[in-house]
């Protein structure tokens, strides 16, 4: 009987440590990098003037006007910023969804859309998902200028002469 009491006592003793609680601390740490840039005042709200263009130059679907340069100035940039993705969102043209749709109205042009191009003059489709955008290298701690172009492109012929207006919003994703 005494042996049974010792065995039961030993078993209860082995199970006892699981019943005790100990104070412990988990430390979680990290670092928030200064890896963003501010959009300079001149780039917050601006207009790109596509100039006056003759309707006859839109002789075929895909015909374009000369590209007009514009830029987005990022200043100041953080000391850890390395790159940025720039996307443009807006109402897409119903015929060519890579283009911005022209605003409608009584004196509005029709049959064309606005194409946005990167600094190499390659098309940047509107409303493109972030995963399809390329990273542009930035210089940390300095002002960075991102160059783009805009132009009109015929989506149908003949085009209707009139006022050209379209609106795009740009988004920035920093690395």
Stretches with model-predicted labels:
Residues 2-4, 20-175:
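Mature extracellular/passenger domains of Gram-negative fimbrial/pilin and adhesin proteins
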Residues 4-12:
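Sec-dependent signal peptide hydrophobic core
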């Amino acid at each position: 009987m005494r042996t049974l009491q010792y065995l039961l006592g030993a078993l209860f003793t082995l199970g006892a440590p699981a019943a005790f609680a100990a104070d412990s601390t988990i430390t979680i740490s990290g670092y928030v990098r200064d890896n963003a840039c501010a959009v300079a005042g001149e780039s917050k709200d601006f207009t790109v003037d596509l100039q006056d263009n003759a309707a006859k130059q839109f002789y075929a679907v895909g015909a374009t006007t000369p590209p007009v340069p514009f830029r987005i100035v990022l200043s100041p940039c953080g000391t850890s910023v390395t790159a940025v993705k720039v996307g443009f969102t807006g109402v897409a043209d119903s015929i060519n969804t890579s283009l911005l749709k022209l605003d409608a109205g009584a004196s509005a042009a029709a049959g064309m859309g606005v194409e946005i191009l990167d600094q190499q003059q390659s098309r940047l489709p509107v409303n493109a998902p972030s995963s399809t955008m390329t990273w542009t290298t930035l210089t940390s701690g300095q002002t960075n200028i991102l160059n783009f172009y805009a132009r009109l492109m015929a989506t149908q012929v003949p085009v209707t002469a009139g006022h050209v207006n379209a609106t795009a919003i740009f988004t920035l994703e920093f690395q």
